[in-house]
Curated annotation (Swiss-Prot):
It comes from Serratia proteamaculans (strain 568). GO terms for biological process: response to toxic substance. PANTHER family: P-HYDROXYBENZOIC ACID EFFLUX PUMP SUBUNIT AAEA, P-HYDROXYBENZOIC ACID EFFLUX PUMP SUBUNIT AAEA-RELATED. It is found in: Cell inner membrane. Forms an efflux pump with AaeB. This is p-hydroxybenzoic acid efflux pump subunit AaeA. Keywords: Cell inner membrane, Cell membrane, Membrane, Transmembrane, Transmembrane helix, Transport. NCBIfam families: PRK10559.1 (NF007850), RND_mfp (TIGR01730). One of its GO terms (molecular function) is transmembrane transporter activity. It is a single-pass membrane protein. The chain crosses the membrane at residues 11-31.
Amino acid sequence: MKNFSIKITRIAITLILVLLGIIAIFKAWVFYTESPWTRDAKFTADVVAIAPDVTGLLTDVPLVDNQLVKKGQVLLVIDQPRYQQALAEANADVAYYQTLAAEKRREAGRRVRLGVQAMSQEEIDQANNVLQTVEHQLAKAVATRELAKLDLERTTVRAPADGWITNLNVHAGEYITRGSVAVALVKKNSFYILAYLEETKLNGLNKGDRAEITPLGSNRIMHGTVDSVAAAVNNSSSTVNSKGLASIDSNLEWVRLAQRVPVKILLDDKDQLHPYPAGTTATVVITGKNDRATDSGSPFVRLMHRLREFG
């Protein structure tokens, strides 16, 4: 009888342990698959493609790659003598047409004063027409001069904002064309996170929720706030054929891959001071309305938080 009781006790303990193991595995699976977190997150920043608005030789590139620059700082200088000469020519044209217009204005005024007793009405009208033509040429010359001034001003390319110069691939002496990208400027204080959360993890996610960001291969924990969720993503299962009809890819009903949706997370100000390079990877955990305290939660929850941040 005693042996039977011991046997029953062992079986009961075994069943209880198995049941607890199943519950733990189930909770871990739910926690892993449904809680709002992802390892697929990228540091992102506003990047300005710096391209000149004029064409010519680069005469000065006072930069080094990955340099921090201030708004208004000179980035590129392009062939100023050529554009200074163009402005001088435009000024000369304006001066010429101003003199010519003054002369034609006096001549037309004299003919009007003399009137038809001294000359024909046709000659008077002809003088007025010549004056109008010269005045139009003067207006065109003035407009050309203003464009020459603008071109000369734009031979000096300046930083549109504070930020870091990166991927500098031009040097003094090279010929650069209008609109060709010379360098990229990563705006300071513009860093944010794009966290690609599976659609199954978006339930309950709200603007203003707090987030923890752990860069790949780092123990540093950064913080941010959910700003927005993408309003749409590309539907890879549907295209439009040549007749305008939808073409739907075949899909196995028992195999459905969750679509990833970009969630924009704004970094806290203190983390903007020392951001990771744009394009690098991070793990993101949405903690709800408040930041997660390091000593809060059950040991199981804390363990799961730690495990999923390896990456």
